[in-house]
Design a protein with these regions (language model features):
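All-alpha effector-binding/dimerization core of bacterial HTH-type transcriptional repressors
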Residues: 23-192
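N-terminal helix-turn-helix
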Residues: 1-19
């Protein structure tokens, strides 16, 4: 079942199991890889990460994050940077909705070594059930250009992700920017 779901095989009545080797060779598949460290490793890179000290902010001041239905008074901002062979590859702004953050543990986020998805489970009071993802083209602003080591005005891909808790609350909003020199976002679409 799993191999069929991942597109590695197709089961056809009368033909049996058909193997798709091209699927096995596809790198950086966002439909099967969860976590940016693993995504970059799958691309063949040596990966390092840097997480900024979390800080409380009263608004989301990043263009590109949908703030409709956002009634939080404050957010815990956590920024993640991922490096591919020492080069800046991915930069994430993550706004954890304040009313769902375990405040007594918030400063422990900096030393937390797990993935961002595991971090949400560790530091939020509501378990994440799913996320809604939107991909959009973007242009590198001066701050993003400096962070990702690209030229101002260069095209980027941005991934906006809203994390939804088990009680249908938005518990975190993120905007991730990708350096196209190091990241290919590959997605398998099954047709059979």
């Amino acid at each position: 079942m799993a191999l069929n779901r991942e597109g590695v095989i197709t089961k056809k009545h009368g033909l049996g199991n058909l193997i798709h080797r091209t699927t096995l060779n596809a790198k950086m598949r966002i439909d099967t890889i969860h976590g940016f460290r693993k995504l970059l490793e799958d691309g063949g890179y040596r990966v390092s990460c840097k997480r900024t000290s979390p800080r409380w902010v009263t608004s989301i001041d990043v263009k590109g994050i949908d703030c409709s239905n956002c009634f939080e008074e404050r957010f815990l901002l956590v920024e993640n940077r991922y490096f591919a062979d020492g080069h800046p590859a991915i930069y994430g702004h993550n706004y954890l909705c304040g009313s769902f953050v375990r405040e007594s543990e918030a400063q422990d986020i900096l030393s937390y070594q797990g993935s961002f998805y595991d971090l949400l489970g560790q530091f939020l009071t509501e378990e994440v059930a799913n996320s809604i993802n939107t991909f959009r083209p973007a242009i590198a602003t001066a701050p993003l250009a400096e962070i990702l080591d690209v030229a101002v005005g260069d095209p980027l891909i941005q991934w906006q992700e809203s994390f939804i808790g088990i009680f249908d609350h938005i518990v975190c909003r993120s905007l991730i920017s990708f350096n196209p020199a190091y990241v290919d976002l590959t997605l398998l679409r099954k047709w059979t």
